[in-house]
Design a protein with these regions (language model features):
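PRPP-associated nucleotide enzymes
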Residues: 1-173
Length: 173
């Protein structure tokens, strides 16, 4: 299966850097490929709702979706106000793009430099476990692998014991 990249809004720069390395490695292996990036978009309607739109076929491909839930610089207009995207907005866009490729891609992996909800790794009294539930939701949607960096508490992967969870520590570099 061919490997392809999808960038959620706000992760274009990181996706571009990953793509540069992949193109260089492919050329060294004798594969002439201009880019691994699939054009996509998450347009918003006037109501504030959005949709995920993938602009090329992904049939049979291994898809890596890059999302940066901690990027607060991404904005969108809603009722003539400029809104900054929250981690919840980024996670919703990730799920939209997963839905857009579901059932067509061979395998879906998510590259999430900052783990969504990662600071909420254990429950105290009556509070939510957003990270664990988010990982379970991604697994239910068909995501096979999560790649993250320096997870606050890597034991959160216990929420999805059958899904691959790669936590790269910066000390490895």
């Amino acid at each position: 299966a061919d490997m392809r990249l999808i960038s959620c809004p706000g992760a274009e720069e990181l996706t571009g850097l990953i793509d540069k390395h992949l193109v260089r490695w492919a050329k060294a292996a004798g594969i002439d490929k201009e880019t691994f990036i699939i054009p996509c978009d998450c347009p918003r309607f006037q109501s504030g709702d959005a949709k995920g739109l993938v602009k090329e076929s992904v049939r049979g491909d291994d898809i890596f979706i890059v999302v940066d839930p901690g990027n607060y610089s991404v904005t969108y207009k809603l009722f003539n106000y400029e809104n900054h995207m929250s981690p919840d907005d980024h996670f919703a866009n990730l799920k939209r793009l997963i839905q857009a490729v579901a059932g067509k891609a061979h395998r879906v992996s998510v590259i999430m430099p900052s783990l969504y909800g990662g600071r909420q790794h254990r429950r105290v009294v009556r509070e939510s476990l957003d990270c664990a539930v988010a990982l379970q939701e991604l697994q239910t949607m068909g995501v096979r692998n999560i790649i993250t960096f320096d997870a606050h508490d890597p034991r959160v992967q216990n929420a999805v014991p059958l899904m691959s969870f790669d936590n790269a520590m910066p000390t490895y570099q």
